[in-house]
């Protein structure tokens, strides 16, 4: 059974991926502070940082 904490963490990680891929540095910072995992990977094996870098949002890599 999946716990509510696991579901919440997964939602945070999904939001982090979207924020990183679109260059929303403020959202990335807030999500990391709330517990999003910068090392999590999406279904293609990409991390939030690799999505940010691949989209040209290199300032996110400094977080």
Curated annotation (Swiss-Prot):
Matching Gene3D superfamilies: Ankyrin repeat-containing domain
Give the record's keywords alphabetically.
ANK repeat, Plasmid, Repeat
Q: Where are the ANK repeats?
A: 11-43, 44-63
Q: Tell me one Pfam family matched here.
A: Ank_4
The family database entries (InterPro entries) matched by this protein are listed as:
Ankyrin_rpt, Ankyrin_rpt-contain_sf
Is the keyword Repeat assigned to this protein? yes
State the source organism's domain of life.
Bacteria
What is the protein's name according to its record? Putative ankyrin repeat protein RF_p14
Natural source organism: Rickettsia felis (strain ATCC VR-1525 / URRWXCal2)
């Amino acid at each position: 059974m999946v716990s509510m904490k696991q579901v919440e963490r997964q939602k945070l990680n999904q939001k982090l991926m979207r924020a990183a891929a679109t260059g929303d540095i403020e959202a990335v910072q807030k999500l990391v502070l709330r517990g999003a995992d910068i090392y999590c990977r999406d279904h293609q094996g990409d991390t939030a940082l690799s999505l940010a870098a691949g989209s040209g949002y290199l300032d996110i890599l400094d977080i």
